[in-house]
């Protein structure tokens, strides 16, 4: 006797994880302004129907006024900068783990802004991935003076 299983019997998790500010004071928010040398206190809640995996925070310049399609507010932007005028644009990109088995997680990180970076418009990008590999992205425009 041989037992067979079918992949049709496996329920696949296709639901995206959620990046939310429900029940917390989220930070940063759209159009928030920071100064060089300050700390960005990152605070967001992640949830998933099955199990969270990890998250990533990326900060990069928006001197060319590009978009990621997730911004809600229209922030007042500085004039566009040509890449030849960049002296020291800031790029931050860090992965963080979420404890195994968690369906909800309050993420907290304090991110130091270097004192010598180019000022101007930046994007603060959050990516959260669940254990099935589904990913949600949220991008917020911020300004660094």
Model feature map: region roles:
Residues 14-145:
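First exposed extracellular module after export/assembly in secreted or surface-exposed proteins
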Residues 2-3:
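C-terminal motif of bacterial Sec signal peptides marking the signal peptidase cleavage site
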Residues 6-7:
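Short, conserved catalytic or interaction motifs in soluble domains
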């Amino acid at each position: 006797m041989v037992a067979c299983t079918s992949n049709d019997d496996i329920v696949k998790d296709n639901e995206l994880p959620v990046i939310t500010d429900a029940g917390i004071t989220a930070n940063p928010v759209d159009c928030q302004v920071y100064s060089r040398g300050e700390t960005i206190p990152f605070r967001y809640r992640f949830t998933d129907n099955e199990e969270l995996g990890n998250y990533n925070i990326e900060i990069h310049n928006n001197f060319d006024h590009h978009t990621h399609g997730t911004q809600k507010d229209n922030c007042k932007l500085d004039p566009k900068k040509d890449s030849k005028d960049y002296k020291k644009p800031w790029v931050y990109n860090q992965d963080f783990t979420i404890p195994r088995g968690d369906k909800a997680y309050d993420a907290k990180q304090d991110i130091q802004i270097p004192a010598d970076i180019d000022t101007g418009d930046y994007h603060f990008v959050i990516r959260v991935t669940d254990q099935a590999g589904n990913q949600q992205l949220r991008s917020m425009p911020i300004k660094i003076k």
